Design a protein with these regions (language model features):
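Generic alpha-helical structural element
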Residues: 52, 106, 123-127
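Accessory alpha/beta interaction modules
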Residues: 1-97, 107-109, 160, 164
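Short, charged alpha-helical interaction segments and adjacent helix-coil junctions
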Residues: 13-18, 112-166
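Pocket-edge structural micro-motifs
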Residues: 64-67, 102-103, 142
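C-terminal segments that line or cap access tunnels to active or ligand-binding sites in enzymes
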Residues: 96-107, 116-121
Length: 166
């Protein structure tokens, strides 16, 4: 799952599903933080044409939907913006945000539909109109032979990654 969309206010979003907390075997470090940085850079490069002013860059969000708790703190959501280390009240205001959505979370306030989405991701439980729409769309896509084949291959890869992650 990798989705890039923009809303009516020209805010751009890159959403990606993460089923495994990968480490780089050479450095023994987790890849998700650097992947976030890379995706922010890709969004900016795509959104700003050569010669355009930097202040034309729209707000961007890189959102990882994780089926694991990257920080092991139990939050439903971890949101990051750039802040001054010497004075945490100062925000850089570059309008670049990274969010890690933790489908296994237990702490914090989230919208009911987001919680339903987490339940759907974790257990394929349809318990709201929102998750019913998602489930219906997936069912429809499975009917298309080409999409169905790609979906089955993706599901097999996700299953393999989940097994490796356990």
């Amino acid at each position: 799952l990798d989705i890039i969309v923009a809303d009516d206010k020209n805010t751009h979003y890159n959403l990606e599903m993460q089923v495994k907390n990968n480490k780089n075997p050479d450095t023994d470090t987790y890849v998700l933080p650097k992947r976030s940085r890379y995706y922010q850079a890709l969004l900016d490069i795509d959104l700003l044409q050569q010669g355009q002013e930097y202040d034309l860059l729209p707000p961007t969000y890189v959102i990882f939907i994780c089926v694991f708790d990257f920080f092991a703190k139990g939050n439903y959501v971890y949101t990051f913006k750039k802040r001054c280390l010497e004075n945490l009240e100062l925000e850089l205001q570059d309008e670049a945000t990274t969010m890690l959505l933790n489908t296994k979370g237990t702490h914090g306030d989230i919208f009911k539909d987001i919680k339903s989405f987490y339940d759907y991701v974790n257990n394929h439980i349809v318990n709201s109109d929102f998750t019913k729409q998602i489930d219906d769309e997936i069912s429809y896509l499975k009917l298309d032979t080409k999409v169905r084949r790609e979906y089955m291959l993706m599901e097999a890869r996700l299953l393999d990654e989940r097994r490796e992650g356990e």
